[in-house]
Swiss-Prot record:
It comes from the Bacteria. PANTHER family: RIBOSOMAL PROTEIN L25/GLN-TRNA SYNTHETASE, ANTI-CODON-BINDING DOMAIN-CONTAINING PROTEIN, RIBOSOMAL PROTEIN L25_GLN-TRNA SYNTHETASE, ANTI-CODON-BINDING DOMAIN-CONTAINING PROTEIN. This is Large ribosomal subunit protein bL25. Gene3D superfamilies: Ribosomal protein L25, beta domain (2.170.120.20), Ribosomal Protein L25, Chain P (2.40.240.10). The keyword RNA-binding applies. Part of the 50S ribosomal subunit; part of the 5S rRNA/L5/L18/L25 subcomplex. Contacts the 5S rRNA. Binds to the 5S rRNA independently of L5 and L18. One of its GO terms (molecular function) is 5S rRNA binding. GO terms for cellular component: cytosolic large ribosomal subunit. It comes from Rickettsia akari (strain Hartford).
Length: 199
């Protein structure tokens, strides 16, 4: 289980643009928790606290304990609205954690991409997917998926079938897809032309 952050929240009973503006004047932002077949819960959060958490790496896959009137809810961020100028958080959607497995987006970390064999030979590391959708055991939710691409040659593609996922996780889709490629000097090859890593 990855680190769990804590957030204090207050119940929200007034809605609409005017109510949201009033909250923001108090240094708070509106938020909602829904999903897992549960009744949605409308809350407000301290703006500085949630913005600080948002700026942490891999926020979208961060487990959070939200406490409302001494009741605690384990949630995951779903969507975040930011102020267009200040980048402070203006609204957050959370989802309740499911009972056994959780469908979620997880960031991909391509470890060693600057040192990859194909890059050293003049190729360009092209990221096709920055996140993947996984089905994860709720007791083993990863912050990210780390892939070592140091030995990836030039003119190759990295496919989902070659990736070892964290324990308790699987891809939502069974269809194979490309995560990254190393493009040769003369431009990218098609997936059919580009050999898979390890071949």
């Amino acid at each position: 289980m990855s680190e769990i952050l804590d957030l204090e929240a207050k119940p929200r009973t007034e809605f609409g643009t005017g109510a949201a503006r009033a909250l923001r004047r108090e240094g708070r932002v509106p938020a909602i928790i829904y999903g897992a077949g549960k009744t949605p819960v409308s809350i407000s959060l301290e703006e500085k606290a949630i913005t600080k958490y948002y700026r942490k790496p891999a926020f979208i896959s961060q487990l959070i304990n939200v406490t409302i009137d001494q009741k605690q809810y384990k949630v995951l961020p779903k969507a975040v609205e930011l102020h267009p100028v200040t980048d402070m958080v203006r609204h957050v959607d959370f989802v309740f954690l499911e009972a056994k497995t959780q469908k979620m987006e997880v960031p991909i970390v391509y470890e060693g991409k600057e040192r990859a064999l194909g890059v050293k030979r003049g190729g360009y590391f092209n990221i096709v997917k920055r996140r993947v959708t996984l089905l994860c055991d709720v007791n083993n939710i990863p912050r990210n998926v780390t892939i070592d691409v140091t030995n990836m040659p030039i003119a190759t593609s990295l496919k989902s079938s070659k990736i070892e996922l964290p324990k308790g996780c699987s891809f939502v889709t069974k269809k194979e897809f490309v995560l990254a490629t190393i493009i040769g000097r003369r431009g990218a090859k098609t997936e059919a032309e580009a050999p898979e890593v390890g071949k």
